[in-house]
Amino acid sequence: MTTQETVKNTRTLVGRVVSDQRSKTITVLVERRVKHELYGKIVARSRKYHAHDENNEYKLGDLVEIAEGRPISKTKAWVVTRLVEKARVV
């Protein structure tokens, strides 16, 4: 028999950190653009996800990539995979 490698397709999303108050957890706002069914206008839809941040290294305003994983807590099943863009200091 040959061994087959199973490839897991995990969902990944890119969003902005809107809260980093909790320990080892950040809140990420993910925006997507969809076409309105009836009127055809492009509208922005958004959703917030709680993501695991083991070392508390991501700060407010950072653009991060999150991946779906196993449930870590009641509301947290996403893990931060990488930093896309650091927050700009104004």
Swiss-Prot record:
Coiled coil: none annotated. Gene3D superfamilies: Nucleic acid-binding proteins. It comes from the Bacteria. Keywords: Ribonucleoprotein, Ribosomal protein, RNA-binding, rRNA-binding. One of its GO terms (molecular function) is structural constituent of ribosome. Transmembrane segments: none annotated. GO terms for cellular component: cytosolic small ribosomal subunit. Pfam families: Ribosomal_S17. The keyword RNA-binding applies. One of its GO terms (biological process) is translation. Belongs to the universal ribosomal protein uS17 family. NCBIfam families: PRK05610.1, uS17_bact. PANTHER family: 40S RIBOSOMAL PROTEIN S11 FAMILY MEMBER, SMALL RIBOSOMAL SUBUNIT PROTEIN US17M. One of the primary rRNA binding proteins, it binds specifically to the 5'-end of 16S ribosomal RNA. Part of the 30S ribosomal subunit. This is Small ribosomal subunit protein uS17. The gene is rpsQ.
